[in-house]
Amino acid sequence: MRLSSLLALLRPALPLILGLSLGCSLSLLRVSWIQGEGEDPCVEAVGERGGPQNPDSRARLDQSDEDFKPRIVPYYRDPNKPYKKVLRTRYIQTELGSRERLLVAVLTSRATLSTLAVAVNRTVAHHFPRLLYFTGQRGARAPAGMQVVSHGDERPAWLMSETLRHLHTHFGADYDWFFIMQDDTYVQAPRLAALAGHLSINQDLYLGRAEEFIGAGEQARYCHGGFGYLLSRSLLLRLRPHLDGCRGDILSARPDEWLGRCLIDSLGVGCVSQHQGQQYRSFELAKNRDPEKEGSSAFLSAFAVHPVSEGTLMYRLHKRFSALELERAYSEIEQLQAQIRNLTVLTPEGEAGLSWPVGLPAPFTPHSRFEVLGWDYFTEQHTFSCADGAPKCPLQGASRADVGDALETALEQLNRRYQPRLRFQKQRLLNGYRRFDPARGMEYTLDLLLECVTQRGHRRALARRVSLLRPLSRVEILPMPYVTEATRVQLVLPLLVAEAAAAPAFLEAFAANVLEPREHALLTLLLVYGPREGGRGAPDPFLGVKAAAAELERRYPGTRLAWLAVRAEAPSQVRLMDVVSKKHPVDTLFFLTTVWTRPGPEVLNRCRMNAISGWQAFFPVHFQEFNPALSPQRSPPGPPGAGPDPPSPPGADPSRGAPIGGRFDRQASAEGCFYNADYLAARARLAGELAGQEEEEALEGLEVMDVFLRFSGLHLFRAVEPGLVQKFSLRDCSPRLSEELYHRCRLSNLEGLGGRAQLAMALFEQEQANST
C-alpha cells in the first residue's frame, strides 16, 4: 500500500529522474574517453580551452610553453608580380557604407538658368547636402556656386532619361532618396528633409502629387513634375535597366508623364500622395496671387508651391514661409518655457532654482578665484579689453557689429513689451559689459539712456539697465575644402647681413629634417644686401652661405637650393615677398620662415593642412626660448610670490637635464603658410585701395600677416606651433619700422628675456651684489 502510494507520487517526476541519470552516465563515459586519449595534441588543445586534463599532460604542456619559440615567417614580395596598392577611401563614411539622406535634382532650361534656377539655389541650397541642376543646353555656363550638368539635348524625355542615368551612375550608392523638381517650384526645404527622414528606405516609393493619365485607368497615376516628387534608391536601381527601352517606346511631351508611364509599364509602380502616414502636400499658386495675403491651411502646410513665374516671387515665398517657421519656433519655445515654470515649482529648489532665461543652463559657478569669468567693458566706440594688452582700442569689425546687434535687440524687446503705452528711443549707451560663459553663451549688461514717449506725446529721459544673453546654438560642422599632405612646400628664407652667421646652422637643420627624410619641400634663400655691401671690390657677406648651400647640393644629389640677391636700404617683409612671388607659379604653397626656425616634417604637414587655397592662411606662433644667462639649465626656485617657473619647450628631452624655459611669442609673425594666388589677390587689393606715396608708406609698416588681415577675405588662422622652437636671440628692431612694428619688436625682445621667477632672481642677485 505504501509502495503504491509512493510510486503514485513519484510518477510525474520519473521522466526527469531518468533524464538526469542518463545525462550523468553519458558525461562520465565521455570523461573516461578523453582521459584515455590524452596523448592526442588536438585533445590537448581542447583541454587548454577548458576541458579536463590529467596532471601529466598539464605538466608536459607547461614545460612545452617554457621551451616554445615563435617561428617568424618573413614576407617576400614577388618582384615579377605587379605591386597592388591598397586603396583606402578618403572618408570613413565611404568605408562603412553610410549614405546621405537626400539629393535634390532641379530641371532647368536655357531661358531660366540664370533667373529661376539662381533663385532656387539661394533659397534652398543651404538645406540639402547636394543640389544639382540639369539642363539640355550644350556647354551651359554655371552661375557662381551652382553645379550644372549639361546633357546637350533639350527633348523632355531625353533630358529626364539622362538625368536619371546620371543620378544612378554618380550618386546611386551615396543617397537614399532623390527629389526631382523644376526650377519654377518653391520647396519648403526643412519640411521636405523631415519627410525624407520619416520614410523607410527599404521600399520602392514614387511619392508626389498624383495625377491621372488621360484615357488611362484609375490605378495608373504619375507624379506632377511641377510640385516635385521623391524616388527611393531601390526604385532607381530597378528602373535603370529599363531607361533605354522606355525612351524608345514611350512618346510624351512632358518629362513627368514619360517617367510615370515608364515606371508603370516596366515595374508596375504608380505615384502615391501618402505613404506610412506621411502625406505629400502641395499648393497650386494662382496667377498674380500675393503670398503675404495667402493664409489657407493648404498653403501653410505645403511642401511645394507651383507655379513660380519669376525670381522675385520665389524670394517673397521664401520670406513668407521663413516668417511662418520663425513664429512656430517662438511659439514652441514659449510653450516649453511655460512647462518648465510649472515643473520647477515641484522641485526641491522651487522657483529659486529657475534660471534666466528659462530653459537655458544656469550661469557657470566658479570653484576658485582662478575660474571667475571677468566682464569686458565697452562703449559704442571703444573697448577696454584688447587682444594686444592695450588698455583701450577702437571697437571695430565683428565686435562692433556684435555690440550694435545687442543694442538693437534690447531696444526691440523693450518696445515689444511696453507698446502701445510706451515707446522707447535710444539716445546713447552709458556703460556696456559682456562676457562669454562657456555653459550659456555671450552675456551682456547694458546701461542705456532712453527717451520714453507716451501715447499722449509726453517725453522723458530714462536710464535703465538691460541684461541680454546670446545663447550658444547647435554645433555645426563647417564644410572645408579638401587638402592633402602631398602638396609641395616652398620655404622662403629672407637673410639679412647680420643673420648670415646663423645661416649654416639653419641649412644643416634643413638637411637633417627635410632633405634626409625626403620631404616634398624646396628652399629659396633671399639674400638681402645693404646699399654699400657686396659691391665691386667689397667682400661678399653671404659667401659662407652660398658655400654651405653648394655643399648641401653636393651631399644630396638632385637637390637644388635657389637663392635670390636683393639690395634694399630698409627691407620690408612685403617687398621681399613681392620679389619671390613673381618667381613662382600661382599655385605655390609658401612657408615664410626665419633663420632661427627649425622646420621639420610635422611642421610642414601642419602647414599643408592649415593653409587652404582661397580659404585660409596659417601663421604659426613659435616657441621662443629664454636667455640662457637668465634661465640656466637648472635654475634655482625664485623668491616667494615671484610666480611659477616658465614652461619648458615642447618636445624637450628630460634625459638631457632640465631644459631652458620659454614662451610662445605672440608678438612675432615672421612665419607664415599661404598660397601664392591668395597673396597676389591681397597684394592687388592693397594696391587698389592705397595708391602712390600712401602705398609706399603703408608697406614700411606692414608685414605679410597684416596684408592678409587687412586686405584679404580669407580666414586667418593663428595658433601655437609646438614644433617651432627657436633659440634665444635678440631681434634687430630697425628704427625705420613703423611705430606698431617697432613696438612689437621691442616687446618681443623684452618678454623673451626670461620668466618672472628668473627675472626676479636676477634682480635679487644684482641687489645683493650692489649691497656688498
UniProtKB/Swiss-Prot annotation:
InterPro entries: Chond_GalNAc, CS_glycosyltransferase. Pfam families: CHGN (PF05679). Residues 1-6 are cytoplasmic. It is found in: Golgi apparatus, Golgi stack membrane. It comes from the Eukaryota. Keywords: Glycoprotein, Golgi apparatus, Membrane, Signal-anchor, Transferase, Transmembrane, Transmembrane helix. Ubiquitous. Highly expressed in placenta, small intestine and pancreas. It catalyses: 3-O-(beta-D-GalNAc-(1->4)-beta-D-GlcA-(1->3)-beta-D-Gal-(1->3)-beta-D-Gal-(1->4)-beta-D-Xyl)-L-seryl-[protein] + UDP-alpha-D-glucuronate = 3-O-(beta-D-GlcA-(1->3)-beta-D-GalNAc-(1->4)-beta-D-GlcA-(1->3)-beta-D-Gal-(1->3)-beta-D-Gal-(1->4)-beta-D-Xyl)-L-seryl-[protein] + UDP + H(+); 3-O-{[beta-D-GalNAc-(1->4)-beta-D-GlcA-(1->3)](n)-beta-D-GalNAc-(1->4)-beta-D-GlcA-(1->3)-beta-D-Gal-(1->3)-beta-D-Gal-(1->4)-beta-D-Xyl}-L-seryl-[protein] + UDP-alpha-D-glucuronate = 3-O-{beta-D-GlcA-(1->3)-[beta-D-GalNAc-(1->4)-beta-D-GlcA-(1->3)](n)-beta-D-GalNAc-(1->4)-beta-D-GlcA-(1->3)-beta-D-Gal-(1->3)-beta-D-Gal-(1->4)-beta-D-Xyl}-L-seryl-[protein] + UDP + H(+). Residues 634-652 have a biased composition (Pro residues). One of its GO terms (molecular function) is glucuronosyl-N-acetylgalactosaminyl-proteoglycan 4-beta-N-acetylgalactosaminyltransferase activity. Residues 629-662 are annotated as: Disordered. One of its GO terms (cellular component) is membrane. The chain crosses the membrane at residues 7-29. It is an enzyme of class 2 (transferase). Residues 30-772 are lumenal. Glycans are attached at N121, N342. It is a single-pass type II membrane protein. Its EC number is 2.4.1.226. Gene3D superfamilies: 3.90.550.50. Belongs to the chondroitin N-acetylgalactosaminyltransferase family. Transfers glucuronic acid (GlcUA) from UDP-GlcUA to N-acetylgalactosamine residues on the non-reducing end of the elongating chondroitin polymer. Has no N-acetylgalactosaminyltransferase activity. This is Chondroitin sulfate glucuronyltransferase. It comes from Homo sapiens (Human).
